[in-house]
Amino acid sequence: MIKMNTMMKIILDEGEQQECTIQVDDVLKKIVDKTKIIKNCIVYDEDGALEEEKINFDRIIHFVGDKTGYEVSCNELRFSRQKIHPCQFPVLARKLSDMLFQKYNPQKIVVYISLYDDEFELRFHTYREDEKLWLDEDLNKYDKPILCWI
């Protein structure tokens, strides 16, 4: 299910006027290939240097609140809007969720995309029934264009 605030909807509606032919599969494959499980969390590890036994997980949870907060803080990636056009955001979010689900089945993945000037931020976390989503369900509360794939 896709959710977005009004600002993102306007941007995507404008993007429908343009031809969106950029392929996101290569970008997504690189992201998914650099993820691993740390303490039952899916974590993006760009350098492959994270070692579970060296992570003070209790201290991290103290600062971020829960596993969702940990994942979202680890899984923050920024890209130029020139690399992937906003009209591709729904496809990007859905495919990333699907690819991570396939790799880490049966965990359901929530993907967020938000815009900041000339770049966009991509974040993701595992959906946990005992924890809240990272962002409020009312995405119009935020002052940036945001899309959420659940």
Annotate each language-model stretch with its function.
Residues 87-90, 94-150:
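Acidic, proline/glycine-rich low-complexity IDRs
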Residues 1-73, 77-81:
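N-terminal leader/targeting segments
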